[in-house]
Amino acid sequence: MGNTLLEQLCDQSSDTKTTTISITDQKSITHPADENAYNGVGSNAEIRFNPNENPSLITQNEISKQVQQEGRPAYIGLAHELIHGMHINSGAARPKTIKLQSITTINGEKYLETLPLEEAITVGLHGVTSKGPTENKIRCNSQDLF
C-alpha cells in the first residue's frame, strides 16, 4: 500500500502536481495551494511534518477488539500527510464535514461527533470507502513488516 501511495505521488503525467515536504516543530498539517484541490483539477500541496509529533489516538486491536490509546509512529504520521497530498494533487480532497455518531456523556448529555470527510477518508474509518491508500491500510501492511 505504501508503494501505491508513492507511485501516485510520483506520477509523471503532463499535469503532475507537486507535494513539498518541510519539517516543523508544530503540528503536522497539509495545505493545498488553491481550490483546485477539491474540484477534480488538482493542486500542488505543502506538507509541514513534525517527526516528533506523537498524538495519542484511540485505536482498536483488530484481533482482540480491545480499544486503547496508542501513539502514532512518525512513518504513519508522514504517510497520513502524504495521503492528503495525493488527494490534493489529484483534486480529490474533500472539504465537507461528516456526522460520525451520537455520543452520550456520563451526565446524559448528547452530542454529535463530527469529523472532516477528508480526515475520515485519509484514515480509512469504517464506513468511509476509499479504493486508494489509507492510514489504516498502511498500518495493517506495516504490521506484516515488523
Show which residues each predicted segment covers.
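Active-site scaffold of zinc-dependent metalloenzymes
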Residues: 19-76, 85-89
